[in-house]
From Swiss-Prot:
The gene is ruvA. It comes from Bordetella parapertussis (strain 12822 / ATCC BAA-587 / NCTC 13253). This is Holliday junction branch migration complex subunit RuvA. Its main location: cytoplasm. Has three domains with a flexible linker between the domains II and III and assumes an 'L' shape. Domain III is highly mobile and contacts RuvB. Residues 65-137 are annotated as: Domain II. Belongs to the RuvA family. Keywords: Cytoplasm, DNA damage, DNA recombination, DNA repair, DNA-binding. Residues 137-141 are annotated as: Flexible linker.
Amino acid sequence: MIGRITGTLIEKSPPVVCVDVNGVGYEIDVPMSTLYALPETGARVTLFTHLVVREDAQLLYGFGSSAERSTFRELIKVTGIGARTALAVLSGLSVAELSQAITLQETGRLTRVPGIGKKTAERLLLEMRGKLGADIGATPHAAGGHQSDILNALLALGYSDKESQAALKKLPEGVDVSEGIRLALKALVR
């Protein structure tokens, strides 16, 4: 397996880049977040890679960090998520944002990614729960461990993900679930 490539970036044509390594040009599919972070053509780059060998093709996927590659590998294990969809997820959400969405069970955030419908988002949340290390970036803002319960209650009441998140940010430190819901509803009514 090819785990990492270092060479000269010779071409960028989204979502593919071409990296020259000692005279051999490797075409590598990358998420848009990685593509935007790459330097101009002619510069030296290092990409962490994942090789997929199929009957009709050998495909190389590249990432700016090993954490991003690990997340990609976890995503493609989810039923209904292929490599293209996993790239779309990583193009739309950083690893920290994805981890937070999984921890807080935010289907709304995932369904904004092209190719992810409600059922796929729910399956992804179910199958990925607890698989992204220490759930990077998912530390609850104000409501301690009750934040996801409060968020789910607000979403069940018909409030959007954006409205619910804004209300959660206004909650005081360490509030319990029932008090948190009451305060969040009060903030949303204003």
